[in-house]
Amino acid sequence: MQKLQISVYIYLFMLIVAGPVDLNENSEQKENVEKDGLCNACTWGQNSKYSRIEAIKIQILSKLRLGTAPNISEDAIRQLLPKAPPLRELIDQYDVQRDDSSDGSLEDDDYHATTETIITMPTESDFLMQVEGKPKCCFFKFSSKIQYNKVVKAQLWIYLRPVKTPTTVFVQILRLIKPMKDGTRYTGIRSLKLDMNPGTGIWQSIDVKTVLQNWLKQPESNLGIEIKALDENGHDLAVTFPGPGEDGLNPFLEVKVTDTPKRSRRDFGLDCDEHSTESRCCRYPLTVDFEAFGWDWIIAPKRYKANYCSGECEFVFLQKYPHTHLVHQANPRGSAGPCCTPTKMSPINMLYFNGEGQIIYGKIPAMVVDRCGCS
């Protein structure tokens, strides 16, 4: 019995001096276990362009508050897309997402898209159908993006057909009201006089900000408008119901709402390319092509640089995260560890059709990876 006790004491003493030798017998296996535990929570997205693209598709629909991608045919797009100066300017001068992240700033923007410009097309209303003598236009239905944001600009755009001889045109915008006792059903909004020369037709814009603000305060007063543009011979030149060859010449409203200023902070990271041998957390290029997966409802951009993060987050490099390092040292197998994730993201501007056929120019936050880091 005494010899057995002595043997046990000697064995325990050797364990204390030598340490847990069984854990060190295969150092390579231990290293692999620790590396596997570094980023269990986000390994699905590393080194996977496909996962990044699928995530982008989900994010865009979510941030635009769309349950599914709008189903708009190419023919419908040609009919709905106004051939108008403000929209053509957005398309022609569209700044496809720049890869300019040299300043290293990090934007804290909201999750949902911040709308800047909304193009609203006219629709029919029950009131217009009940009016005797069909009014020459237009009822505009306003989305929540207009109703719950501060309107800074509202322009009604109308197209005037070309004339054969020089003439003066008298443009009048009337607001429909409920019939009064004397039979009046219109009240004037704006009127203007302009000179037209022979040649092509022209687009004319009219400020309707005050009217729009009143409509938003009292939605029941929004019964529609009538548009008249009479030349000296009494001919109406305004395109209110487009005929053959007049697709894209419908009247429409261009509404601009406020954008929220963002705060910023500093951050830096590594940039790599597809041929890089860098194993640490790094930003890699990735271009998303909307046409490639059939999203014709996005007018612009047709593609943009999204980028993605990939790489290892070794604890030896984590001076930036001492608390994480200490947790890992205390429990290396129980700690999930830091992940290679975006630390700076920037928005993209997008011109698109929503589910109601409205054309919206908005800013979608956090769609471009500008910096990557371990966190």
From Swiss-Prot:
Cellular location(s): Secreted
Positions of the pro-segment in this chain: 19-266
Name under which the protein is recorded: Growth/differentiation factor 8
Metal-binding found in the keyword field: no
Residues carrying a glycan: 71
Record-annotated site: Cleavage: 98-99
UniProt KW Disulfide bond keyword: yes
Function: Acts specifically as a negative regulator of skeletal muscle growth.
Subunit structure: Homodimer; disulfide-linked. Interacts with WFIKKN2, leading to inhibit its activity. Interacts with FSTL3.
Molecular function in Gene Ontology: cytokine activity; growth factor activity; heparin binding; identical protein binding
Cellular-component GO terms for this entry: extracellular space
Cysteines paired by S-S bonds: 272-282, 281-340, 309-372, 313-374
Family, as annotated: Belongs to the TGF-beta family.
Pfam families xref list: TGF_beta (PF00019), TGFb_propeptide (PF00688)
Organism: Lepus capensis
GO biological process, one term: negative regulation of myoblast proliferation
Signal peptide limits: 1-18
Keyword vocabulary terms for this entry: Cleavage on pair of basic residues, Cytokine, Disulfide bond, Glycoprotein, Growth factor, Heparin-binding, Secreted, Signal
Principal subcellular localisation of the protein: secreted
InterPro entries assigned: Cystine-knot_cytokine (IPR029034), TGF-b_C (IPR001839), TGF-b_propeptide (IPR001111), TGF-beta-rel (IPR015615), TGFb_CS (IPR017948)
Post-translational note: Synthesized as large precursor molecule that undergoes proteolytic cleavage to generate an N-terminal propeptide and a disulfide linked C-terminal dimer, which is the biologically active molecule. The circulating form consists of a latent complex of the C-terminal dimer and other proteins, including its propeptide, which maintain the C-terminal dimer in a latent, inactive state. Ligand activation requires additional cleavage of the prodomain by a tolloid-like metalloproteinase.
